[in-house]
Curated annotation (Swiss-Prot):
The keyword Ribosomal protein belongs to this UniProt entry's keyword annotation: yes
Protein's UniProt name: Large ribosomal subunit protein bL34
Organism of origin: Synechococcus sp. (strain JA-3-3Ab)
An individual GO BP term: translation
Gene3D superfamilies: 1.10.287.3980
Length: 46
């Protein structure tokens, strides 16, 4: 039987790649800027 090797947790997902996490750093804000420029419907996971 195969095993589930990846079990993501929502808390970590939000902490690492949520909107507020992106806003916290300069490079994160750059990510948001790029995604806005590209016209993404969702800027960050949250």
């Amino acid at each position: 039987m195969t095993q589930r090797t990846l079990r993501g947790t929502n808390r970590r997902r939000i902490r690492v790649s949520g909107f507020r996490a992106r806003m916290r750093t300069a490079s994160g804000r750059q990510v948001l800027r790029r995604r806005r420029a590209k016209g993404r419907y969702r800027l960050a996971v949250s």
